[in-house]
Amino acid sequence: MNKNKPFIVVIVGPTASGKTELSIELAKRINGEIISGDSMQVYKHMNIGTAKVTPEEMDGIPHHLIGILNPDDTFSAYEFKRLAEDLITDITNRGKVPIIAGGTGLYIQSLIYNYELEDETVTPAQLSVVKQKLSALEHLDNQQLHEYLAQFDEASAKNIHPNNRQRVLRAIEYYFKTKKLLSNRKKVQQFTENYDTLLIGIEMSRKTLYSRINKRVDIMLDHGLFREVQQLVEQGYESCQSMQAIGYKELIPVINGQMIYEDAVNDLKQHSRQYAKRQMTWFKNKMSVHWLDKENMSLQMMLDEITTQIK
C-alpha cells in the first residue's frame, strides 16, 4: 500500500454480476463505506430498474451517491468525480476504507485516474433555461432530434446513432450548458493515479452472465418495475434523460400503447445483455483489473482474495 495516497477499493463488473453483495460483505470485513459508481442509482424514485440496494441489503453499511437527485436532474462524470473525491476524503479521515462499487466505466476511470473533466455546473436560473430548451425538443422523434444536433455539432451527430436518444440529448444539453461542442471536448488522462487503488472485477462466462441477467429482469418485473415506470411517467418524467436508461425506455412504449408487454420484456433482456457485453469490453480494454472468477470462487473465497491483496 502507498501511504502517500488514500487507499480505496474499487469493485467493477457487468450488470447482474454481484457487485452489491461483494461490496457489502467486504465493507463488513475491512470497516468500509460504499460509494456507488453507477450513473443511474443517483436518481430518486428509480429503484427497481437500477437495481438499487435496499436498506435491508445494506445491512448497516453506509452507502453514498444513491437516490440524491430527482429524475429530471442531470449528472455527469465531472459531478460524480467531484462528489466522490469529497466522500473519499471524509471516509478516509474517519478511519474507514472507501469502497467504490459500480459498472459505469467512465465514472470509475475519471475518479481513479487524473482526468481533467470540464465543469458543466450552471446556476439554478441557467439550468431552468436549459431544461426549457430541452423540453421544447420533446416532440421531435429520434431522427428529427439527431438532425437538430447535426445543425450545430455535425461531428457528434456522425458519431452517435440516431436511435441513441440519450446520447443525442446529452450532446445537445452540453451545448446548451457550455456553448461548446461536445465533439471538441478534451478529456486528458495523466498516467498517474489519484489513489492507492485496489481494482477488483467480477467475471464469469457469458452464458452464466446472460442467464443471471434474464433472471434478474424477471425478478425486477415481479417486484413492480412496470408500475415504477408508470409512476415516473405519470409524474411527468417521461422525456427526461434518466428515463432513457435500460429498464425504463423499453417499458414506456407499452404504457403508451405502442408495444405489447412481451416484446418490451424481450427488448429489455436483450438490451441488458448487450450493455453487459459493452461493460466487460470497457473494463478489459481500458483498465487494469484484478479479476475474480465468480463461477469458480465462492463469496468467501473472493473476500479472502481481496483481503490478501490489501495486506
Curated annotation (Swiss-Prot):
Keyword tRNA processing: yes
Swiss-Prot/TrEMBL keywords: ATP-binding, Magnesium, Nucleotide-binding, Transferase, tRNA processing
Binding of substrate, residues: T15, A16, S17, G18, K19, T20
A family per Pfam: IPPT
Residue ranges of the region described as Interaction with substrate tRNA: 38-41, 166-170
Record-listed E.C. numbers: 2.5.1.75
Residues marked Interaction with substrate tRNA (site): T104
MF terms in GO: ATP binding; tRNA dimethylallyltransferase activity
Cofactor(s) in the UniProt record: Mg(2+)
Reactions that this protein is recorded to catalyse: adenosine(37) in tRNA + dimethylallyl diphosphate = N(6)-dimethylallyladenosine(37) in tRNA + diphosphate
Enzyme class, broadest EC rank: transferase
Ligand binding (ATP): G13, P14, T15, A16, S17, G18, K19, T20
Gene Ontology biological process terms, A to Z: tRNA modification
Matches recorded under PANTHER family: TRNA DIMETHYLALLYLTRANSFERASE
Subunit structure: Monomer.
Family: Belongs to the IPP transferase family.
Role of this protein: Catalyzes the transfer of a dimethylallyl group onto the adenine at position 37 in tRNAs that read codons beginning with uridine, leading to the formation of N6-(dimethylallyl)adenosine (i(6)A).
Protein name listed in UniProt: tRNA dimethylallyltransferase
Gene encoding the protein: miaA
